[in-house]
Amino acid sequence: MLSSNKSWKKENPTYQNVKAFLGSHGPLGTRRYKYSDIKKITNSFKDKLGQGGYGGLYKGKLQDGCFVAVKVLKESKGNGEEFLNEVATISRTSHVNIVTLMGFCFEESKRALIYEFMPNGSLEKFIYKENPSNVDIQLGWETLYNIAVGIGRGLEYLHKGCNTQILHFDIKPHNILLDENFNPKISNFGLTKICPREKSIISMVGAQGRSHIVAWGGRGPCKKKKFPIRL
């Protein structure tokens, strides 16, 4: 059994990619948990908050009594890039409008991310009537304005407030979480790109395999802008 486990680690590309990343980045600003800890924190995944293509989201509680949201990722044939993006980017940030990553788990094929708990969930359920989880609370114009300003401040921090520029690439209502006072926090950094501060144009390959040239408000000159549109 032990021999089989070692063979799996050696042959699994995702495991090797994540292991190499953690080794090259040294100590991170967030705590690393064992999978057994994740089960204790979530009370064996008792309280499920949601389900997505990434896996399941569960409510949990740390030993100090702090409530958290635990994203348990599906086992994937990919190279673990989205998991690495989450750990690498959020661990670099500290801002009132960016969700806090409180820890992560990487144990063989098991991967999980632990975030601060946002009682009001995502902005999506408050603005889309067709959403099955739609709530009866109507957000006033002042609240919506404050949410928009908060999102803008969070993006400005990612672009200009960190040592490197962090480009989110997936800003949408589902990825904007709201705390108990409806203050917005940007979440879900799976598609994030990190690039030098002096760079204003980046070339990347989209999810459909098409390449895009993306420009934003950096210092360099831009003559051509082409943005991918997600429908």
Predicted features, each with a name:
Residues L2-L231:
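Conserved eukaryotic protein kinase-like
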